[in-house]
């Protein structure tokens, strides 16, 4: 999965979002071990400290768990993952609807366009 970073907000925030998407899409399965901070930083083309900051935020959100001797793993709490999936989906729907309203595109017009 490519790491396209937009630079329109803090890099670590973009990394958090991309890793969340990898988790909710199943790219990283519940209970699976993540690559090391260094490996992911190299893959993403960012400083390891930036990746570490993103991992810390993901740990605070409950999506990642640190295992002292075996690195970081995706939580096995599928309810937590599902909740994050629903939150992200709702945010994307809200942003889309806001964009459509900004260009005066109504629900009726959208429905008519589809048929």
Locations of regions flagged by a protein language model:
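N-terminal intrinsically disordered/low-complexity leader segments
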Residues: 1-8
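Conserved segment of winged-helix/HTH DNA-binding domains
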Residues: 78-103
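Conserved small/polar residues in nucleotide/adenosyl-binding loops
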Residues: 106-115
């Amino acid at each position: 999965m490519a790491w396209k970073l937009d630079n329109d907000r803090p890099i670590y925030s973009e990394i958090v979002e991309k890793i969340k998407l990898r988790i909710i899409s199943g790219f990283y399965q519940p209970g699976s071990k993540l690559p090391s901070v260094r490996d992911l930083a190299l893959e993403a083309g960012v400083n390891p400290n930036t990746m570490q900051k993103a991992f810390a935020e993901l740990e605070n959100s409950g999506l990642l768990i640190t295992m002292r001797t075996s690195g970081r793993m995706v939580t096995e709490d599928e309810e937590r993952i599902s909740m994050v999936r629903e939150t992200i989906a709702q945010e994307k729907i809200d942003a889309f609807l806001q964009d459509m309203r900004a260009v005066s595109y109504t629900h009726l017009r959208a429905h008519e366009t589809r048929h």
